[in-house]
Amino acid sequence: MRAAIFAAIGALLLSPASCQSGMEYDADNLAKPTLSIKTFRGAPQNSFEEFPLSAIEGWTGTTKTVKIKCPEELDSNLHVNNATMGYLSSPLSTKLIPAIYILVFAVGMPANAVTLWMLFRTRTIRMTIFYTNLAIADFLFCVTLPFRIAYHLNGNNWVFGEVMCRATTVIFYGNMYCSILLLACISINRYLAIVHPFTYRGLPKRTYALLTCGLVWTTVFLYMLPFFILKQEYYLVQQDITTCHDVHNTCESSSPFQLYYFISLAFFGFLIPFLVIIYCYTAIIWTLNAKDRRWLWYIKASLLTFVIFTICFAPSNIILIIHHANYYYSNTDALYFVYLIALCLGSLNSCLDPFLYFLMSKITDHSTAYLTMVKLS
């Protein structure tokens, strides 16, 4: 039901009325906002932004707002402010972030490859389907990481083309929410197996697992469509670089759907699954007693899951909402570089998920014996 609601909202936000990009013009040929994905702000050459005159140093007159006109054809060559230029050329963006991505690639790529190899050799299907999909999502993410590493090491200069930029952006964000939803599905599966063993025993596990994973992938795909539909690649005149997703054209201004899109993404893609996971593991630990051999393993799995959500998912989703709220209401992008750092930490989940599989595989072995005992009793 949660994933179905998630998909419905995604479809609503992707409808023609809410997903058009670019600008509309009123009778005075003044730009009016439509939907676009917001990052750093960049202005086309020979254009002006809307700003209060009181912001000009030394201005003592009455406060007014200057209405500006955007070019009818959107320009791919942009100018950015000094703060954005400082971030794009800083060691944080060109050294620290790619160093973390290199670490994630070096650990996550072989770890998820080994996990997939072990899963394909496993004949049991109780948990294999969920973990296979989780490992595939992480593996795809690791495959695209070298492109982002090269991008940052090259001074945030993207050389792989618009299509590849959109594809890596979709996979980058899609991996996070696909992982979150699959971890929630795994926790529900374990909850039913331990807290409601008789109900779990009568379920068509393979069918439910395949349908659930298919719904997760479909939901995430629908929600990621705006990143693939809208332009992500822009050339920055001052620095002579081409950015990927990090800068957008200010003439593609935001609409209320912009804010609602990201709020719904964080709410249905992070908060609700996180609450479901907390409830499921709490109920499991409460049901099992300390003498049960599975109890300690579930404590470890719960702690690891909590670490994954706290370090990898919580910061980026919280900052995501704050950033886009500031962008919509105050037209500022000061938090975006903080959000990029949080996203960088979020990539660590691709390294931690394989260890969660190894923990849960131990639990599954004990659960198999437990269900056999229940069946014979």
UniProtKB/Swiss-Prot annotation:
Matches recorded under InterPro entries: GPCR_Rhodpsn, GPCR_Rhodpsn_7TM, Prot_act_rcpt_3, Protea_act_rcpt
Glycosylation sites: N82
Residue numbers on the Cytoplasmic membrane side: 121-127, 189-205, 280-296, 361-377
SUPFAM superfamilies cross-referenced by the UniProt entry: Family A G protein-coupled receptor-like (SSF81321)
Record-marked site positions (Cleavage): K38, T39
Biological-process GO terms, alphabetical: blood coagulation; G protein-coupled receptor signaling pathway
Gene3D superfamilies cross-referenced by the UniProt entry: Rhodopsin 7-helix transmembrane proteins (1.20.1070.10)
Membrane topology recorded in Swiss-Prot or TrEMBL: Multi-pass membrane protein
Propeptide residues per the UniProt entry: 20-38
A molecular function (GO) term: thrombin-activated receptor activity
UniProt keywords, alphabetically: Blood coagulation, Cell membrane, Disulfide bond, G-protein coupled receptor, Glycoprotein, Hemostasis, Membrane, Receptor, Signal, Transducer, Transmembrane, Transmembrane helix
Location(s), subcellular: Cell membrane
Signal peptide positions on this chain: 1-19
PROSITE patterns hit by this protein: G_PROTEIN_RECEP_F1_1, G_PROTEIN_RECEP_F1_2
Topological region Extracellular: 39-94, 148-166, 230-259, 322-335
GO cellular component: plasma membrane
Primary location recorded for the protein, binned into one broad class: membrane
Annotated CDD domains: 7tmA_PAR3
PANTHER family xrefs: G-PROTEIN COUPLED RECEPTOR (PTHR24232), PROTEINASE-ACTIVATED RECEPTOR 3 (PTHR24232:SF0)
Description of how the protein assembles with itself and partners: Interacts with INSC/inscuteable and GPSM2.
Family classification: Belongs to the G-protein coupled receptor 1 family.
Known role: Receptor for activated thrombin coupled to G proteins that stimulate phosphoinositide hydrolysis.
Name of the protein in question: Proteinase-activated receptor 3
Organism: Bos taurus (Bovine)
Gene for this chain: F2RL2
